[in-house]
Amino acid sequence: QAKRTGKYLRKHKSIQAVYASPLQRCHATAKFATKGMELDINTLDGLKEMCLGDWEDMRFSELAEDHDFINRATGDIHHSAPNGESLDQVATRVVAAFRQIDEQHADDETVLVVSHGVALAVAISVFLHNSPARWGDYHLNNCSLTEFELSPDPIVYRLNEYAHL
């Protein structure tokens, strides 16, 4: 999937910078997606996935069924798994990372950000609705493309596009 994404990006986009979560899978995805572009991959801790603490190795279905975590976290953005992060904490961290990236690049530059599903959904929810509570509205497939502009009123040009896969 990452190779196909890279092929699409090389053909259709001019990318000036790449940022990725430091977690291995994201970094590998960024490497495959930018092969041949001669760009360094900048890692930002703020792009990491939501930390689920004591529940980190559980499947999403287990979290939903056994702990009602998804409903509880969506209903209360300050709710967290034991020793984990709340949606509010994820929002603060991920939005700060996007703002940092935005500040380091000119308005006409295209920056590729490779992160994780929940982290990206939370960021999109904050940018469009000023709250992480609607993160569940934004399902993002692996290696899908979401393109937006961080202006005072953020603009989404594409969301979860995966026809290139």
Where are the predicted features?
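Phosphate-handling substructures
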Residues: K35-V95, E149, Y157-R158
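Generic beta-sheet signal
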Residues: D107-G117
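Loop-to-helix element that buttresses phosphate recognition and phosphoryl-transfer chemistry
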Residues: Q1-A28, S80-V95
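Active-site signature of alpha/beta-hydrolase-fold catalytic machinery across serine-
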Residues: F32, V122, V126
